[in-house]
Amino acid sequence: MSAMMVKLGLNKSALLLKPSAFSRAAALSSSRRLLFNTARTNFLSTSPLKNVASEMNTKAAIAEEQILNKQRAKRPISPHLTIYQPQLTWYLSSLHRISLVLMGLGFYLFTILFGVSGLLGLGLTTEKVSNWYHQKFSKITEWSIKGSFAYLFAIHYGGAIRHLIWDTAKELTLKGVYRTGYALIGFTAVLGTYLLTL
């Protein structure tokens, strides 16, 4: 309808000028429905059958609710992820997203820390943070933290390259997706280990 209006040189406000046959029929139908419901309500409220009708409506509502509950008990529920066979694509997609969130949190934490320190004149420098880090953490903890960030960075960097390959409409078949997935795992192992040894 909007394409026809454009051809005629009209905009959407032209619809408001003259009601169509459809809108007139819809308005007539809704007014008939309103009139019927009002008449029925008036009849029942003035009728001696009011109590009987009310009781019948209550019984019908209870019976209807019981039928609905039986139907709901048989209705299939939305399946949980645990019923599916795990796929390489899930894990890599999840790791790609989680790695960005974790690295982003670390980045913003230190950025805010240094920004607030400069504003408040606390004199926080990278040298002081480095000294505190090496004094408070054991070598195993240092390697764990460094390894976590090294591998998180490696998998996110590799995932970004993988997405750039997909953006060129390459490796979009199932075999191609798995091929790039296994390449990403190998790339992550190599780059993460290299970053850990720095």
UniProtKB/Swiss-Prot annotation:
UniProt entry tagged with the keyword DNA damage: no
Molecular-function annotations in GO: electron transfer activity; metal ion binding; quinone binding
Binding site for heme: 156
Location in or out of the cell: Mitochondrion inner membrane
Listed cofactors: heme
Topology in membrane: Multi-pass membrane protein
Record text on subunit structure and interactions: Forms part of complex II containing four subunits: a flavoprotein (FP), an iron-sulfur protein (IP) and a cytochrome b composed of two integral membrane proteins.
Protein's name according to its UniProt entry: Succinate dehydrogenase [ubiquinone] cytochrome b subunit, mitochondrial
Organism whose genome encodes this protein: Saccharomyces cerevisiae (strain ATCC 204508 / S288c) (Baker's yeast)
